Amino acid sequence: MSKEDMIELEGVVIEMLPESRFRVRLDNNMEILAYGSGKMKMHRIRVLLGDRVTVEMSPYDLTKGRINFRHPTANPGAGPRPSHHHRR
């Protein structure tokens, strides 16, 4: 399936599940099960409860999706999130 066939929607993470999965409520009030994309894992982009995300879904299964983008937080003074990877 090509990228043009995918449906892209926005939503909010409402629940964090085991194995890097998330329950996301889309803007149309549908709830889906989503996982982080490989690029997000590779660059250690953390997705937390309440984050606004962009989800890519297949038209054949509208209950599952892949999180492609985590939108910046609305609080500009919050600063970057702490990393758990510290060098000694």
Swiss-Prot record:
Q: Where is this region: Disordered?
A: 66-88
| Pfam families assigned to the protein according to its UniProt record, in alphabetical order | eIF-1a
Q: Name one GO cellular component term.
A: cytosol
Q: Which GO terms describe its molecular function?
A: ribosome binding; rRNA binding; translation initiation factor activity
| InterPro entries on file | NA-bd_OB-fold (IPR012340), RNA-binding_domain_S1_IF1 (IPR006196), S1_domain (IPR003029), TIF_IF1 (IPR004368)
The record's listing under HAMAP family reads: IF_1
Q: Give the UniProt family note.
A: Belongs to the IF-1 family.
Protein name, as recorded: Translation initiation factor IF-1 1
- Gene encoding this polypeptide? infA1
